[in-house]
Structures are given as structure tokens and as C-alpha cells.
Amino acid sequence: MKSFIEVAKPVVDSGIYMCAKFDQASCEALAQVQKLLGVENPVSAEKLHTTIVYSRKTVDLFPASGISEPARLVDVEKWDTKYGNTIVGVLESDYLHSRFNDAMDAGATYDFDNYKPHVTLAYDSRIEDISGVKRLLTLPVDLTIIKEDAESLDLDKTVEDITEHIEHRGESS
């Protein structure tokens, strides 16, 4: 069997981005969390994900499919990122830690001190104090990971590439 690198055959090593995707029920539960928090610029259901690998070096790790792995949303935090006030749901998941460790063992790079599994709920949210709205949530929220996707690392994604503004969601409320 060919390795991932043999299949992808990168000429210039742009790195690799791999993420875990959730089932429909999990995406609906996360959309409810977004709604309860009242976030602006929510990540759309089809773009909700958890980053596993964000490596400046391509590694030999195939994305998994046909899986059913549990994860739990256990907290919500505000992070200051290049996209503004980013609202993330902090996850507990042995599976995500295991896959991250697989990537690191395969030679992946990582720009942060620790791997903290999370799902981004909104970019440029304009929420300054998350503690006030966080109390509206009932945690934990059970989620199910059903597959992984991988692509070349793109360091120039815009907020429009990764979100869907609420006025485009088709919600009547």
C-alpha cells in the first residue's frame, strides 16, 4: 500500500492540515450552542471541525473515515486570533489526542506549546466577556466524530473562507 506522501506527491512541502468532522446531530447541537451564545459570524454547520494537525511539514498520516468516536464539549473560551475574538468550544476526546500524537510521531510540526482540542464556534464574534453568556449553556455536550479530512496547509485563509455570516444561514429568528 502506498503511503499518504506517495499518494499526495507534494513538489513543494506546503505542510498538512487535518481535521475531524462531526455527525449531523453534533453539528445541530453545536449550532444550538452558537445560538445560545448569540455569536456573530458563526462557523457554518458544514465547516464545523476540530483541527488535529496543522503542520508546516507534510507527514505520512492518512485521514480516517467511517469512524464513530466520542468527544465532549466541556467549556467555551474566547481566544484572541488574527480573525478577532474567536469563540471556541473546548473538547475532551481521547481519540483527538491519540490522532495528534500519531501526527507528532510521524514528524509533524506544531506552533503551540500544548494541543488543546477545540471546535471554533465563531470568528470575529465581538463578544468581549464570554463568562456572561457561558452560563447559558448546559455542559457537557456529547459529540460524535465521523471522519477526518486533510488538505495542504493554507496559511492565508480569510474569515470568509471559514465562516458563514448569520444573515446567510436562513434562520427566521
UniProtKB/Swiss-Prot annotation:
3',3'-cGAMP binds at Y17, E151. SUPFAM superfamilies: LigT-like. Keywords: Host-virus interaction, Hydrolase, Inhibition of host innate immune response by virus, Viral immunoevasion. GO terms for molecular function: hydrolase activity. The keyword Hydrolase applies. 3',3'-cUAMP binds at Y17, E151. One of its GO terms (biological process) is symbiont-mediated suppression of host innate immune response. It catalyses: 3',3'-cUAMP + H2O = U[3'-5']pAp[3'] + H(+); 3',3',3'-c-tri-AMP + H2O = A[3'-5']pA[3'-5']pAp[3'] + H(+); 3',3',3'-cAAG + H2O = G[3'-5']pA[3'-5']pAp[3'] + H(+); 3',3',3'-cAAG + H2O = A[3'-5']pG[3'-5']pAp[3'] + H(+). It comes from the Viruses. The keyword Hydrolase applies. The active site is at H49, T51, H118, T120. Belongs to the anti-CBASS protein Acb1 family. Counteracts the host CBASS antiviral defense system. Phosphodiesterase that enables metal-independent hydrolysis of the host cyclic di- and trinucleotide CBASS signals such as 3'3'-cGAMP, 3'3'cUA, and 3'3'3'-cAAA. Does not cleave cGG or cA4. Besides evasion of the CBASS system, might also enable evasion of the type III CRISPR systems that use cA3 signals. This is Anti-CBASS protein Acb1. It comes from Escherichia phage RB16.
